């Protein structure tokens, strides 16, 4: 990371000189129309060049943002659609490097999330923000929003941010970890179905090498006393059951999760289970974890590959 990279990041988040000098009634009018959810007035304003030139300008109290961010924050779908129709930048950043999609996800506005994704919003959010829409949805248990993000290409595994120092390497904090710790089993399962790595929620060996002592999902789930369903899912999706080191104190406890892990260590995987792992792993490596439905095999086998049997 050099000074030029840092300067570029801060320049992206600073308002233009024109924005600073012209906190005009035009910008206030646009924001007021969005705040009032008055899509008709907003549309009429944006048909005039004196207003449209400020469609991507950041303004407002608190966290200055664009009108599109404001619409996403309040869940004002009709205003959001009007702004997009008039050419608003779908991935515009506020001063915290958050995109309108990130804001919509944070506030739980599923309809706005769908429209933004269909308009081409990056499902991963901004590379300059250490959080992401997927992390937020997994933490909040917003399974429908998480489904939309993953269906539009969001990454289920942890990836290094740009620049490198923007990545949190002090601890494991991928979406699988958050879903487990916050008790969102549906999100946990959904992430695994979309190719999340069941060991570290990360396939980037370079990134893992920078973590002093990476902890596996199995370790985290046992440490936080997660329900046995989490342990079973990790085992079923191919987690390395020998990675967690279990002390004698733990193995002597009457814990269902530990019992499942010990049972898995003592019982070889069935051939059918191993085939499922190989097929799913091959699809993930090809970047098409959801292509199972396209396989020319009996429906019952498709259901098995999707962990529905």
UniProtKB/Swiss-Prot annotation:
Pathway: Protein modification; protein ubiquitination. GO terms for cellular component: cytosol; ubiquitin ligase complex. This is Ankyrin repeat and SOCS box protein 12. Probable substrate-recognition component of a SCF-like ECS (Elongin-Cullin-SOCS-box protein) E3 ubiquitin-protein ligase complex which mediates the ubiquitination and subsequent proteasomal degradation of target proteins. Keywords: ANK repeat, Repeat, Ubl conjugation pathway. One of its GO terms (biological process) is protein ubiquitination. Belongs to the ankyrin SOCS box (ASB) family. Residues 268-308 form the SOCS box domain. The gene is ASB12. PANTHER family: ANK_REP_REGION DOMAIN-CONTAINING PROTEIN, SOWAH (DROSOPHILA) HOMOLOG. InterPro entries: Ankyrin-SOCS_box_domain, Ankyrin_rpt, Ankyrin_rpt-contain_sf, SOCS_box. The SOCS box domain mediates the interaction with the Elongin BC complex, an adapter module in different E3 ubiquitin-protein ligase complexes. It comes from the Eukaryota. Pfam families: Ank_2 (PF12796), SOCS_box (PF07525). The keyword Transmembrane helix does not apply. ANK repeats lie at residues 63-92, 96-125, 129-158, 171-200, 213-243.
């Amino acid at each position: 990371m050099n000074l030029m990279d840092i300067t570029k990041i801060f320049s992206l988040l600073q308002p233009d000189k024109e924005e600073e000098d012209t906190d005009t009634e035009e910008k206030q009018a646009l924001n007021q129309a969005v705040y009032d959810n008055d899509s008709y007035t907003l549309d009429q304003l944006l048909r005039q060049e004196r207003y449209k030139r400020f469609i991507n300008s950041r303004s407002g109290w608190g966290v200055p943002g664009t009108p599109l961010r404001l619409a996403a924050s309040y869940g004002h779908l009709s205003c959001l659609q009007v702004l997009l129709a008039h050419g608003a930048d779908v991935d515009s950043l506020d001063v915290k490097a958050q995109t309108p999609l990130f804001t919509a996800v944070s506030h739980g506005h599923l309809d706005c999330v769908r429209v933004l994704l269909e308009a081409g919003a990056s499902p991963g959010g901004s590379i300059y923000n250490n959080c992401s829409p997927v992390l937020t949805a997994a933490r909040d248990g917003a399974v429908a929003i998480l489904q939309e993000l993953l269906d539009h290409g969001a990454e289920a595994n942890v990836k290094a941010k740009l620049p490198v120092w923007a990545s949190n390497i002090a601890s494991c904090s991928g979406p699988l970890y958050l879903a487990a710790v916050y008790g969102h089993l549906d999100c946990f399962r959904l992430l695994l179905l979309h190719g999340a790595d069941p060991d570290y929620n990360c396939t980037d060996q370079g990134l893992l090498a920078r973590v002093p002592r990476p902890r596996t999902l199995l370790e985290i789930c046992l440490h936080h006393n997660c329900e046995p369903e989490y342990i079973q899912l990790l085992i079923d999706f191919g987690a390395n059951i020998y990675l967690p080191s279990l002390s004698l104190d733990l193995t002597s406890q009457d814990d269902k999760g530990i019992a499942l892990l010990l049972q898995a260590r003592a019982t070889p995987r069935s051939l059918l289970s191993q085939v499922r792992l190989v097929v799913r792993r091959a699809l993930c490596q090809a970047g098409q974890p959801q292509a199972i439905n396209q396989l020319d095999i009996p429906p019952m086998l498709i259901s098995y590959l999707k962990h529905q049997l």
